[in-house]
Each structure stands twice: as structure tokens, then as C-alpha cells.
């Protein structure tokens, strides 16, 4: 039986993010890279995460931290709510909510990730955490207020 991709695309993993995580293909744009990196977190694949971080970030030094995080975190879902890039600019952004449980507590990472394209490959550079008011609609698309959803 086929497994749906953890990235939330509703497509089989083998047809969605697996070709990127396995190295068969290079992610064609920042959104595909973001989704495949989320899958790597779900599947505890530190090698892919390090390979897709921009070389200037020194991600190899984060291997132990990544491995420790894998042991305590269960990823529950990804919602991409905004993306923008132009291949001519070689820079792109993807905004998302990644839900997880850690130590029995649920949480969410809300980030606007920045990506850079070099030599035909997109890399994750860094991210910022956008600020939402407690009464703003939650960016995950649930229809709830932020304070009653991902802002808890």
C-alpha cells in the first residue's frame, strides 16, 4: 500500500518528495525544497537536511543537535501558506506552519524561510518568525484565531 507524503500534498510520497530526499532529483523551486526538508525531519534524515542547507551556514556542525531533536519530536503536519520566488532572482521565500509534539506537548513552528539558488540548486538559508496578533486568523488556514490554534 502506498504512503501519502508527509508534506501534506495529498500525493504519494514516492511521487512527491521521495525523489528529492533520495537524491534522484533536485528540488525545482523553494516550495518543493521546503516540503522535502519537512519530510526529512519526519523521516529523521539529517544528511538531506545538511545537504540542502546553504554551505555558508555550516550545517554539518548541527548534526548532533538534529539527531537529538529527532529523538524527542514527532511531526504532525505541514501547511504552506505563502510562497514567492523568481528563478531570475535566485532567491525565494516560503511561509509555513509545521506542527509537532515534543515531550507530550504540542507546538508549531511558524516561519518565513529564505532560499538561495546557486549552480541550479536551491538551498535553505535561514528563516524569520512572523509575528501574529492573538486575535488574528491563524496562518495555518484552520479558520480559528491564532491564540486558539498554533499560537497556544
Swiss-Prot record:
Pfam hit, one: SEC-C
Gene: ychJ
Family that this chain belongs to: Belongs to the UPF0225 family.
NCBIfam families: PRK01617.1, PRK01752.1
Transmembrane segments: none
Annotated protein name in UniProt: UPF0225 protein YchJ
Highest taxon listed in the record's lineage: Bacteria
InterPro entries: NTF2-like_dom_sf (IPR032710), SEC_C_motif (IPR004027), UPF0225 (IPR023006), YchJ-like_M (IPR048469)
Amino acid at each position: 500500500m502506498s504512503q501519502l507524503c508527509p508534506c501534506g500534498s495529498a500525493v504519494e510520497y514516492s511521487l512527491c518528495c521521495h525523489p528529492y530526499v533520495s537524491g534522484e532529483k533536485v528540488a525545482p523551486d523553494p516550495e518543493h525544497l521546503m516540503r522535502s526538508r519537512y519530510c526529512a525531519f519526519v523521516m529523521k534524515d539529517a544528511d538531506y537536511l545538511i545537504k540542502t542547507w546553504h554551505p555558508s551556514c555550516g550545517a554539518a556542525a548541527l548534526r548532533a543537535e538534529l539527531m537529538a531533536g529527532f529523538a524527542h519530536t514527532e511531526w504532525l503536519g505541514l501547511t504552506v501558506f505563502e510562497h514567492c520566488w523568481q528563478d531570475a532572482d535566485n532567491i525565494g521565500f516560503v511561509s509555513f506552519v509545521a506542527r509537532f509534539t515534543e515531550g507530550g506537548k504540542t507546538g508549531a513552528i511558524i516561519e518565513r524561510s529564505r532560499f538561495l539558488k546557486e549552480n541550479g540548486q536551491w538551498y535553505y538559508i535561514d528563516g524569520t518568525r512572523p509575528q501574529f496578533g492573538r486575535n488574528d486568523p491563524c496562518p495555518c488556514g484552520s479558520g480559528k484565531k491564532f491564540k486558539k490554534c498554533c499560537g497556544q
